[in-house]
Design a protein with these regions (language model features):
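Short, charged, amphipathic alpha-helical segments
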Residues: 38-46, 93, 120-130
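Carboxylate-rich helix-loop segments that flank metal/cofactor sites and access channels
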Residues: 57-93, 97, 101
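Alpha-helical bundle segments that constitute or directly flank the non-heme di-iron/ferroxidase center
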Residues: 1-32, 88-113, 131, 135
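Acidic interhelical loop/turn segments
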Residues: 107-130, 148-150
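A short linear boundary/processing microfeature
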Residues: 31, 58-61, 65, 112, ...
């Protein structure tokens, strides 16, 4: 099955981004001690995992081997900066940035992919990501307010 190279590139990027954000949310859950925040982070990781498998199915349907697409080696710079980044920014903000990147990829895919089943999937993912962005913003503001009040 032939597919536009831009769509293929964006799908591959989306797949790796879902994997990365899932891991980011799991890291955030491990780093946070507030139960409601842990639930939120773990729930978001599950959502990203489901989205990852949906996109991997799309890639398989169009004849792309998913194993060839997934970035095998972790980004050393990312691992090294994780602790530093946690100290500088709250975890909600960090995940918010990643979700905004996902939203941009999904919007591009909706714009250029004309296959209805795939665009419906992108729209469902976009809705979930948009909800997550709102929640991350809300939690981030709450965390910043608590930090401000405690100082």
């Amino acid at each position: 099955m032939s597919i536009n190279k831009n769509i293929r590139f964006l799908l591959e990027k989306l797949l790796n981004s879902y994997r990365e954000t899932k891991l980011s949310y799991l890291n955030s859950a491990d780093s946070h001690y507030h139960p409601s925040f842990n639930r939120f982070f773990n729930h978001q990781a599950i959502i990203r995992n489901n989205m990852f498998f949906t996109v991997s199915n799309i890639l398989s349907e169009i004849g792309i081997e998913v194993g060839d697409v997934i970035l095998k080696r972790p980004d050393i710079k990312q691992f090294m900066s994780t602790k530093i980044e946690r100290e500088k920014k709250d975890l909600f903000f960090k995940n918010l940035k990643k979700d905004i990147e996902l939203k941009e990829i999904l919007l591009k895919l909706i714009k250029i992919d004309s296959e209805k089943n795939r665009t419906d999937t992108y729209k469902k993912h976009l809705k979930k990501i948009s909800e997550s962005i709102k929640a991350n913003k809300s939690y981030s503001l709450g965390v910043k307010e608590k930090m401000f009040l405690n100082n």
